[in-house]
């Protein structure tokens, strides 16, 4: 095949196939090859920008999408992806303007109504956000996801947990910036706080299980406490970052509750730093952890503390908060003893501390 444009088309079609199959790295290679043979082609720029967006490479995505829009200002697909990239980079006002332009061109795009609602929620415009999520439902959008968003904006009983694909997508896109943003911008310190108390006790654990391990922020601390560390997370991109640390003997892509249901016994330390804010209801987690732990085993975790007395609440930030009484009840029901509790901010949100609970339990 000697015709450069024909070669570019072949790479482009292969990129579309890879993208649809979720093979993002392969899609990136194919679209990059197509762009080299057909520089400036808006369709290639748009799709490569979409891939880079999903890979968490937001600045690169934005540059590609803006180049596409310079040629096709009314490209609704490029507008939508560009808006999403701006939202990921913390520019919600600019993102909203592009979402509105895209939806004026293609009002039936349910996913854009959902993303628009998220941006409005971030801007503190709750009623408009709710209307956008409702419009997404009317256009045939993801029922579970939009109901979850709407629950965070209402006083309705919250769903039992965040949709799995929401969490996976959120952290896949966040992986490249996660550590710096969480630790530096949001003053996140849960891994150190949770493990510091264990280190002071001087106990050596055989096997530690890091639930929702993310990029591995707990890993270096756990490596000093345990002979072997296993990490579980939904996000493949997060696990790839954790793998590079070398702190984990095993890393598995799995839902926390589903993994615990089938997990082998023998973990004498189970830790969950800032994880239950997406798990929601914790009945199954406590039941399975109690089964996995041997007598004397340790279970420690951080929570956002519910401020209105509700055992379980879904906040407008779309994170769950839990009450101390809820945890005490679950501990009692599952043969776990509350050894220590500390109240301290779990992180900051819009430069305001988020009240948190840090809890250390042991199996009786």
Locate each region found by the language model.
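A short glycine-rich, Lys/Arg-flanked "PGG" loop and its adjoining helix->strand segment in the class I
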Residues: 283-295
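Helix-start (N-cap) detector for alpha-helical repeat units in TPR-like alpha-solenoids
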Residues: 8-9, 42-43, 76-77, 110-111, ...
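A conserved beta-strand element that flanks and buttresses the S-adenosyl-L-methionine
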Residues: 271
């Amino acid at each position: 095949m000697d015709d450069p444009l024909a070669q570019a088309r072949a790479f482009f079609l292969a990129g579309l196939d890879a993208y649809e199959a979720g093979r993002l790295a392969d899609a990136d290679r194919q679209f990059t090859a197509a762009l080299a043979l057909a520089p400036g082609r808006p369709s290639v720029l748009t799709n490569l920008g979409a891939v880079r967006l999903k890979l968490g490479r937001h600045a690169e995505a934005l540059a590609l999408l803006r180049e596409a829009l310079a040629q096709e200002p009314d490209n609704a697909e490029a507008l939508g992806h560009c808006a999403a990239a701006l939202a990921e980079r913390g520019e919600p006002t600019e993102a909203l303007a592009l979402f509105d332009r895209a939806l004026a061109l293609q009002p039936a795009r349910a996913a854009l109504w959902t993303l628009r609602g998220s941006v409005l929620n971030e801007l503190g415009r709750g009623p408009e956000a709710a209307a956008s999520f409702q419009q997404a439902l009317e256009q045939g959008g993801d029922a579970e996801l939009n109901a979850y968003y709407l629950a965070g904006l209402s006083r309705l009983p919250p769903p039992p947990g965040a949709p799995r694909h929401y969490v996976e997508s959120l952290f896949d896109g966040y992986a490249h910036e996660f550590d710096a943003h969480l630790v530096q911008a949001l003053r996140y310190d849960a891994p150190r706080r949770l493990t510091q108390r264990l280190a002071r006790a001087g106990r050596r654990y055989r096997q530690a299980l890091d639930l929702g391990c993310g990029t591995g922020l707990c890993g270096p601390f756990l490596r000093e406490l345990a002979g072997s560390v296993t990490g579980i997370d939904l996000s493949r991109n997060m696990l790839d970052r954790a793998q590079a640390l070398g702190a984990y003997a095993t890393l598995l892509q799995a839902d926390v509750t589903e993994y615990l249901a089938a997990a082998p016994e023998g973990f004498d330390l189970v830790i969950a730093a800032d994880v239950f804010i997406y798990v929601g209801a914790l009945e199954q987690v406590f039941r399975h952890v109690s089964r996995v732990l041997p007598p004397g085993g340790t279970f420690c975790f951080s929570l956002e503390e519910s401020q209105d007395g509700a055992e379980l609440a879904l906040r407008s930030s779309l994170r769950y908060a839990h009450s101390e009484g809820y945890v005490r009840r679950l501990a009692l029901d599952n043969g776990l003893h509350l050894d220590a509790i500390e109240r301290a901010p779990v992180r900051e949100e819009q430069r305001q501390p988020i009240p948190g609970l840090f809890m250390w339990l042991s199996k009786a």
